[in-house]
Swiss-Prot record:
This is Uncharacterized protein aq_1545. It comes from Aquifex aeolicus (strain VF5).
């Protein structure tokens, strides 16, 4: 016990005061910063595809540490204020970000890492900070032209390619874009206006195609059943239904002989939640790197050379990072009950930390499958869980009440709050299980017809049947 540091001493105390809480979070931030340094410490030893994944996790971790700083602000209000106001460079650079927020239609939705990283508007402001000699006009000429940008900067500024590469990764302009679902319960943001950009329409067209698993009611037995629909509609035909959701729904019903509910599920899976209400496309699925035509004309057979590396060293590095993340998780578990006032922010931080561990495990599977598989199958109960990863079990004849699952109910509340920001989550919670009463209450509060409220709740997923809507309990892709 005599060797315990200040952090260990404080988290093991029965009661801690406000000052001690501030000290705890400063110590935690210090440890997280040290762990952050370890993520890319050995990148020079590993092939590029692994470096890209570590670099992306590195950036996700930075955003998560920023959440810790907002917690520290709760106990030390002057902390962030001093960070903001001391150096004039901060005032200069933050103006770029404010411009970014003003021009972006989705505001807080864009701040989530899965939407932020890879977003060109976000990248260009980071490039302006990392390459202050360049103008925005120069930077914008190279949108989707990463290789050309590197060559241009080498010639104009004389910076070595390795340094430019590092700066681009810091700006989240990766050579390729890894998919990182860090929060499984996280749904894409929705755009509640009747505006649909060409990028959003391209996203919906792309995601409406392919195999879709949908739940429909058997016309003979009246029971629910799971069916697969292979959607294959050419882009030219889909373009006729740009902004015409009802028309596209009818086309799906006629072409694939499915009912309206099934067509709705396909549209929602593609991101078109309702008329005038579609998803904010996750940026990673929309990044396309386009290089000039003249480069494509030179058809050369290129030998793909795999960079030599020590696979045991890579496995060791991932185990080390995973162990450190677990060690940090211990501290948050110990401090959790002592800080009820910041539970919501702490839960978000811990959830992302667990997802980081999950992503590390995914990378680990590629270098040490024996241990990875042993972790998964050692407990027989896990076998059933693994089987249900792609197909959800127990669907038929089951009544899906939104109140049975706290996760589903929280998602419904989030969606209702998105459509009706005038009500708090606490107000919604009071009407759990009492939808009709909530309709009356909200109609009176907002001075709107009950039919209007009822329809909007239906769109948000709080159905009149009070069952879980298909787009929340969707199965498969």
């Amino acid at each position: 016990m005599g060797d315990m540091g200040i952090l260990e001493t404080l988290v093991l105390k029965e009661k801690i005061n406000g000052t001690e809480k501030a000290v705890i979070f400063r110590e935690l931030i210090k440890k997280e910063m040290e762990l952050l340094n370890d993520y890319c410490a050995k990148n020079h030893l590993f092939p590029k595809d692994y470096r890209i994944e570590f670099c992306h996790l590195h950036n996700i971790k930075k955003v998560n540490i920023a959440r810790l700083l907002t917690i520290l602000k709760y106990y030390d209000p002057r902390f962030i204020e001093i960070l903001m106001s001391t150096d004039p460079k901060v005032r200069t650079f933050i103006q770029y970000f404010m411009e970014f927020l003003e021009k972006h239609p989705y505001f807080e939705d864009v701040l989530e890492p899965q939407n932020l990283f890879g977003n060109w508007d976000y990248i260009r402001y980071k490039l302006k900070i990392l390459f202050p000699q360049l103008t925005f006009e120069e930077i914008d000429r190279f949108k989707f032209k990463r290789k050309e940008f590197i060559n241009y900067v080498k010639e104009k500024l004389g910076e070595p390619e390795e340094l430019i590469e590092d700066k681009l990764n810091l700006a989240t302009w990766y050579e390729s874009v890894p998919y990182l679902e860090l929060e499984s319960e996280m749904t894409p943001g929705v755009h509640p206006d009747p505006v649909m950009t060409p990028e959003e329409w391209s996203f919906i067209k792309r995601h409406i195609k392919g195999r879709k698993n949908i739940i429909i009611r058997d016309p003979d037995t009246g029971k629910e059943k799971l069916v697969y629909v292979e959607v294959d509609i050419p882009d030219e035909e889909l373009d006729k239904y740009y902004k015409n959701r009802e028309g596209l729904k009818k086309l799906l019903m006629e072409r694939y002989n499915i009912d309206e509910s099934g067509a709705e599920q396909i549209l929602r899976k593609a991101g078109w939640e309702a008329t005038g209400w579609h998803i904010v496309p996750p940026v990673h699925t929309d990044v396309e790197v386009v290089y000039p035509e003249e480069e494509k004309k030179e058809e050369k057979k290129v030998e793909v050379k795999r960079e030599p590396f020590d696979i045991m060293e890579l496995a060791k590095h991932i185990r080390y990072l995973g162990g450190r993340e677990l060690e940090m998780l211990n501290y948050y578990e110990l401090v959790h009950d002592k800080v009820p006032e910041i539970h919501e922010k702490l839960h978000m931080f811990m959830r992302t930390k667990r997802r980081l561990l999950g992503k590390l495990f995914g990378i680990y599977y590629t270098v040490d499958p024996v241990m990875a598989e042993a972790i998964l199958i050692n407990d027989p109960e896990n076998i059933e869980l693994l089987k249900s990863l792609t197909i959800s079990t127990g669907l038929r004849d089951k009544k899906f009440s939104i109140y049975d699952s706290s996760k589903v109910w929280n998602e419904i509340k989030r969606r209702v709050r998105f459509i009706f920001p005038e009500v708090s989550e606490e107000e919604i919670e009071k009407f759990k299980g009492k939808r009709s009463e909530f309709v009356t209450y909200l109609a009176q509060k907002l001075g709107k017809p009950e039919e209007y409220i009822d329809e909007r709740l239906e769109r948000a997923g709080w159905l009149r049947s009070e069952e879980i809507p298909a787009f929340i309990r969707h199965v498969g892709p």
